[in-house]
C-alpha cells in the first residue's frame, strides 16, 4: 500500500467520525440519544445505501448493522454491559467499525488502541482505560506478546482473524450469534455526555 492510499484511508475514517460528532450536536437536549442511536436511525433511513467502501469491498448500512449486531449479541452472551470497557487493537478496516459499533449498541466503551503501540505502552493503555478485555487482530499478536509481562491482572483476549493457539477466535464461524438488532434499552442508562470511546 502506498502513502497516498494510506493517508486517504485515514482521512476517510476521520471524516466518518466528524460526521457523527456533527450530527450528535443536534441531539444534545435529548438525554438518552447516543451515537449508536444516530447510526441506527441512519440504517433505518437508508438501509441499501453504501455505508463503507474499503479497497474492493462495499457494505450497505443494512450489512454494516447486521455485522455490528452480531458483535453486540456476542458481547451480551459474554456478559458485557453498559459501563464496561473493551480495548480494540486492530488495523483500519471494516471489521474495526463493525466491532466498535456493535459494542456501542450495548453501551460498552471502546478503548481504541493505535496499532503501533507495544510493550509497556500497550500495557499502560489497557490499564489506564480499565479494560476488562482486549479484541485484537491476529496480525498484531506480536504487539500483545511484547506487552504480556507488563499487563496486570486478568485480561480476556479475543482474536479477530486467523486462529491463534490458546486464544478464543472472534470470527463468523466462532461468533454464530444473531444478526438481529439488540434492544436499545440495553444502553438506556447512557447519556450523550458519557464516553463513547477512548483514543490511545
Task: Report the location of each language-model feature.
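Structural core segment of the AMP-binding/adenylate-forming
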Residues: 1-6, 77-78, 105-173
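Flexible, non-catalytic linker and terminal segments flanking ANL/adenylate-forming cores
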Residues: 1-32
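AMP-dependent adenylate-forming
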Residues: 12-23, 37-60, 196
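Conserved AMP-binding/adenylate-forming core of the ANL superfamily
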Residues: 27-32, 36, 48-93, 97-101, ...
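Residue-level signature of the cytosolic catalytic core of signaling kinases
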Residues: 31-35, 136, 166, 191
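Conserved pre-ATP/AMP-binding loop-to-beta segment of ANL
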Residues: 47, 165, 177-200
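Short hydrophobic segments within beta-strands
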Residues: 53, 89, 135, 198-199
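Residues at the C-termini of beta-strands that transition into short coil/loop
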Residues: 56, 62, 158-162, 171, ...
Amino acid at each position: 500500500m502506498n502513502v497516498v492510499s494510506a493517508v486517504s484511508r485515514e482521512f476517510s475514517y476521520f471524516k466518518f467520525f466528524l460526521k457523527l460528532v456533527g450530527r450528535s450536536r443536534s441531539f444534545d437536549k435529548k438525554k438518552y440519544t447516543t451515537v449508536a442511536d444516530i447510526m441506527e436511525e441512519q440504517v433505518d433511513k437508508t438501509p441499501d445505501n453504501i455505508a463503507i467502501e474499503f479497497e474492493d469491498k462495499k457494505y450497505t448500512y443494512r450489512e454494516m448493522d447486521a455485522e455490528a449486531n452480531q458483535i453486540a449479541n456476542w458481547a451480551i452472551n459474554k456478559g458485557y454491559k453498559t459501563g464496561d470497557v473493551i480495548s480494540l487493537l486492530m488495523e483500519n478496516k471494516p471489521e474495526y467499525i463493525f466491532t466498535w459499533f456493535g459494542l456501542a449498541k450495548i453501551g460498552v466503551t471502546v478503548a481504541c488502541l493505535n496499532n503501533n503501540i507495544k510493550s509497556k505502552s500497550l500495557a499502560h493503555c489497557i490499564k489506564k482505560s480499565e479494560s476488562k478485555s482486549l479484541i485484537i487482530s491476529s496480525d498484531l499478536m506480536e504487539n500483545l506478546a511484547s506487552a504480556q509481562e507488563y499487563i496486570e491482572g486478568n485480561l480476556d483476549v479475543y482474536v479477530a482473524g486467523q486462529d491463534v493457539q490458546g486464544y478464543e477466535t472472534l470470527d463468523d464461524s466462532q461468533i454464530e450469534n444473531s444478526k438481529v438488532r439488540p434492544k436499545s434499552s440495553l444502553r438506556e442508562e447512557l447519556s450523550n455526555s458519557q464516553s463513547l470511546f477512548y483514543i490511545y
